[in-house]
Amino acid sequence: MSLSIKNSGDYMSNIAFAFTLSTLAGLSTLLGFLPLLFNLKDESSIILKSLAFASGVMLTVSIIDLIPESYNLLASIFKGFPALLLLLIFLVIGIIFSILIDKFLPNNNNKLFHLGIVSMLAIILHNIPEGIATFLSASTNQKLGLSLALAISFHNIPEGISIAIPIYFSTKNKKKAFLYTFISGFSEPVGSLIAYLFLAKYMNNFLMSILLSFIAGLMIHIALFELLK
């Protein structure tokens, strides 16, 4: 699939679609709260399986959709090796960004409430650029935007679990667990709003390719070193 930034006659008609996708993708985080509504016999097994599934989805979308799309956009501007080099540079930057989030928001497994808060902050930092990418992708290419939104939705569910469960078991307060999970998910449409207000009018093939490769790096690191650790 290919993006066409220049042929943007129907761009405005895609704005509502893009906002809807990013909002649904973000609020899918709330599905991570659902286990608290049931008496699960093997909760740890469910969490592990959902994390593994989300990791597979994120890797698949990054490798099959985001990276090829980023390269195609770069190849329309730069021929041959420069396009590949730029893709790799911003892919690595995305990975480094995710690593820095882990470094400066350390995970303390001995304190459940702290774990839930740290998870929420880390996920908010992940969700804002994902919201930007979803909005900009969907507003120019609905298929790419839908693919990205689905992948984000799948990995947002176990991320919701990583917030809701520690918060609940540390406070015994389902309302608080729901609220913190909601705040995390709502950061995704906030990212879309940022994209619409400040970034959309400056977007072109080069900037879109940078964003896609950056998000691919971010998602690859999350998939391999956070969801599976």
Locations of the language-model features?
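Intrinsically disordered, metal-sensing/regulatory segments
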Residues: 1-229
